[in-house]
């Protein structure tokens, strides 16, 4: 056997061996395609599909810092220094289509911090601890402000009362409820009918609200009941609501009208009446039988909006507030505001001073 024959035989043997090993080799599977996040534009900006589902999710919120000085326009007391408050609000919306309509949820978590020189106003923080923050100090708290489910016109969960939401709240000022218009957060079951001609109606069963000093929740099986009617068009809107409080067995009602004078200037007026002439109730929290609120908004430029609100109640409280909301850059707004309250009539005996002047500057980054 010559060397050439030996080399050819060795090469043939190596090829045969490698072929046998290849037959037994494990072939790695192809990696699955990655499902990237898809934009969902069916419900507005900021939504995306939750991977693997047809549910759209939006995550948004704001960071806010307030600095207050002067008098407390709610109580008439002198702050004797600066009051500060911070809030981080985180919001989640989900929406998907079903055979019964749009199925949605909304939740809002609030992380609050307050550092007050002389008192607290209840706007920030959880004041359930042992410290007397009414005399100054620091308080923090976490709050589940909203958590509700919607299906078509049906809504159930934690929300704000239809006595406020259906008629459109008050004005676009920070100190809007010096003359109070009712409690806000409540558990509720509600149904809203929306017609195609601008007409809508609502009926709601509510648990009632509470604040730092008072609890207006129901004390049995009978819920608070709210009903309302609204008509809206290009000119503006008119809305009315009636509420029954089973705890005190009294009722309250209000009517609001909004008029768009131009595309930049609008005015509104609201009147309310309660069968119980006391602020200590869930809905008619103004003083006396009746109260009125009114205001105006003027969009001066793309960055600056002027807001004005005035209110007066049967017991003699008058409150006026004005501000300028200035958008420094998109998503960041600075709002200086000044407020005045005159405590007349029956309110004189409940406050330290008859006249109160206060100011606030709010810095808010929304995302």
From Swiss-Prot:
Keywords per UniProt: Cell outer membrane, Ion transport, Membrane, Porin, Signal, Transmembrane, Transmembrane beta strand, Transport
GO BP field: monoatomic ion transport
Record bears the keyword Ion transport: yes
InterPro entries reported for this sequence: Porin_alphabac
GO CC annotations on file: cell outer membrane; pore complex
Subcellular location: Cell outer membrane
Signal peptide residues on this chain, from the entry's feature table: 1-22
Keyword Transport attributed: yes
Pfam families found in the cross-reference section: Porin_2
One MF term in the entry's GO annotations: porin activity
Domain of life: Bacteria
Membrane topology listed for this record: Multi-pass membrane protein
Main location: membrane
Disulfide bonds: none
Domain description: Consists of 16-stranded beta-barrel sheets, with large surface-exposed loops, that form a transmembrane pore at the center of each barrel. The pore is partially ocluded by a peptide loop that folds into the pore lumen.
Function noted in UniProt: Forms passive diffusion pores that allow small molecular weight hydrophilic materials across the outer membrane.
Miscellaneous note of the record: The pore formed by Omp2a is larger than the one formed by Omp2b. Omp2b pores have optimal permeability to allow growth and protection against harmful compounds. The larger pore formed by Omp2a may be advantageous for intracellular growth, when the bacterium is competing with the host cell for nutrients whose concentration is particularly low within the phagosome.
Subunit structure: Monomer.
Family classification: Belongs to the alphaproteobacteria porin family.
Name of the molecule in the record: Porin Omp2a
Source organism (scientific name): Brucella canis (strain ATCC 23365 / NCTC 10854 / RM-666)
High-level lineage: Bacteria, Pseudomonadati, Pseudomonadota, Alphaproteobacteria, Hyphomicrobiales
């Amino acid at each position: 056997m010559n060397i050439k024959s030996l080399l050819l035989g060795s090469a043939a043997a190596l090829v045969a061996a490698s072929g046998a090993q290849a037959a037994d080799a494990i072939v790695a599977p192809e990696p699955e395609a990655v499902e990237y996040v898809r934009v969902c534009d069916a419900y507005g900006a900021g939504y995306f599909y939750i991977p693997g589902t047809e549910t759209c999710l939006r995550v948004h919120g704001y960071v806010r810092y307030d600095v207050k000085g002067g008098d407390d326009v709610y109580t008439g007391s002198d702050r004797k220094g600066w009051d500060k408050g911070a809030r981080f609000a985180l919001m989640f919306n989900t929406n998907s289509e079903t055979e019964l309509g749009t199925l949605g949820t909304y939740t809002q978590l609030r992380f609050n911090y307050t550092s007050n020189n002389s008192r607290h106003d209840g706007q920030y923080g959880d004041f359930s601890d042992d410290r007397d923050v009414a005399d100054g100090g620091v308080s923090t708290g976490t709050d589940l402000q909203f958590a509700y489910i919607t299906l078509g016109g049906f809504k159930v969960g934690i929300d704000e009362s239809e006595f406020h939401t259906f008629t459109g709240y008050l004005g676009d000022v920070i100190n809007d409820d010096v003359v109070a218009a009712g409690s806000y957060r409540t558990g509720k079951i509600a149904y809203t009918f929306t017609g195609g001609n601008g007409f809508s109606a609502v009926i709601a069963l509510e648990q009632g609200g509470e604040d730092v000093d008072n609890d207006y929740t129901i004390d049995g099986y009978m819920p608070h009941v709210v009903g309302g009617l609204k008509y809206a068009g290009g000119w503006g809107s008119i809305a009315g609501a009636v509420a029954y409080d089973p705890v005190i067995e009294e009722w309250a009602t209000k009517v609001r009208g909004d008029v768009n004078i131009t595309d930049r200037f609008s005015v509104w007026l609201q009147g309310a009446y309660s069968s119980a002439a006391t602020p200590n109730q869930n809905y008619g929290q103004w003083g006396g039988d009746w109260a009125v609120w009114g205001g105006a908004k003027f969009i001066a430029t793309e960055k600056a909006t002027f807001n004005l609100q005035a209110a007066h109640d049967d017991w003699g409280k008058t409150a006026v507030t004005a501000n300028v909301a200035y958008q420094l850059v998109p998503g960041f707004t600075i709002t200086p505001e000044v407020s005045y309250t005159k405590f007349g009539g029956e309110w004189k005996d409940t406050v330290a001073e008859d006249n109160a002047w206060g100011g606030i500057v709010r810095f808010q980054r929304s995302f």
